[in-house]
């Protein structure tokens, strides 16, 4: 978009600056942010799960520049019946009126505790990351599914259980003719990075199943990888993605029996499966990409009318 962007990793700064005088490294973080702003003179500060940034720091920055805009994006689930409901709501509301806008991957109207000036954003795709075209390959496996016990947690956590395991195990039991490729459960470790890309390249279809009860528009960022790499993507209809993604781009299902029927249907119908997969990838990369999401964030934060169309902005 032509903007000059300076990224600061709060976690890296904290990790490198723990000492007797700064036990958790957070004092150094606040000073680094303020000093950096003094040199960089940003027009906008965008927070992304930066839980260690103090409200007092933002207050000081806004006093330095009355025109400074501060916004945040938040990708974790916010549904009342989802994981970490209380914790996530405390995190997202931490800075209160110091924020000019908030962007979430859940429909704001479906969140129990309303967030001022909040907007929905989809999990963005990026053609530099989503590079596969699985619909052009004869994939070894039918259905890919991956989960973990935490963001980028490298291995399974002992004693940790996820309700999705029950659903997936039941689905596999009902469909023994479907070749599943499943990670993050049943003693199979999660996959990340380049290894994830290698594994996902071997499946023609993917199941987008997030933690907790389905809530309107919420999905983990896995959805961008499924669509973006050309897998036929299956999504619970209660998520309501058909509000802005055409029905010829993915497959809705309403329960495990419906999902089983459709898995078998598209396992057999390669032509239709590949047609939908290709349409889904084309749509997601064109209309739900990182450039458009970035423009949307800035247009709402600075209140300007963009020349772009945002299909998710109803």
List each language-model region with its residue ranges:
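Conserved acidic donor-binding segment of nucleotide-sugar-dependent glycosyltransferases
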Residues: 249-256, 266-270
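Acidic, glycine-centered active-site loop in nucleotide-sugar glycosyltransferases
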Residues: 243-250, 254, 261
């Amino acid at each position: 978009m032509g903007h000059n962007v300076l990224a600061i990793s709060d976690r890296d700064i904290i990790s490198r600056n723990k000492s007797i005088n700064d036990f958790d490294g957070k004092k150094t973080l606040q000073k680094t942010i303020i000093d950096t702003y003094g040199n960089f003179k940003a027009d906008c500060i965008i927070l992304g799960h930066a839980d260690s940034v103090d409200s007092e720091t933002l207050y000081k920055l806004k006093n330095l520049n009355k025109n400074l805009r501060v916004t945040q994006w938040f990708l974790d689930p916010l549904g009342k019946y989802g994981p970490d409901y209380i914790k996530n709501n405390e995190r997202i509301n931490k800075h209160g009126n110091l924020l000019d806008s908030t962007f979430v991957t859940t429909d704001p109207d479906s969140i129990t505790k309303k967030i001022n000036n909040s907007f929905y954003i989809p999990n963005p795709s990026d053609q530099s990351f989503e590079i596969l075209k699985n619909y052009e390959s004869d994939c070894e496996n039918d259905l890919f599914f991956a989960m973990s016990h935490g963001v980028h947690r490298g291995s399974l956590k002992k004693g940790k259980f996820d309700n999705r395991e029950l659903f997936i195990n039941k689905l596999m039991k009902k469909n023994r003719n479907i070749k599943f490729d499943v990670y993050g459960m049943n003693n199979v470790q999660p996959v990340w990075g380049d290894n994830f890309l290698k594994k996902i390249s071997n499946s023609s279809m993917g199941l987008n199943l997030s933690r907790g009860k389905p809530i309107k528009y919420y999905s983990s960022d896995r959805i961008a990888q499924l669509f973006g790499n050309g897998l036929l993507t299956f999504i619970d209809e209660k998520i309501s993605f058909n509000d802005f993604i055409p029905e010829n781009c993915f497959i809705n299902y309403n329960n495990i029996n419906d999902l089983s029927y459709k898995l078998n249907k598209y396992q057999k119908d390669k032509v239709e499966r590949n047609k939908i997969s290709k349409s889904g990838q084309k749509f997601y990369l064109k209309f739900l990409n990182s450039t458009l999401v970035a423009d949307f964030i800035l247009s709402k934060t600075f209140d300007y009318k963009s020349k772009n169309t945002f299909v998710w902005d109803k």
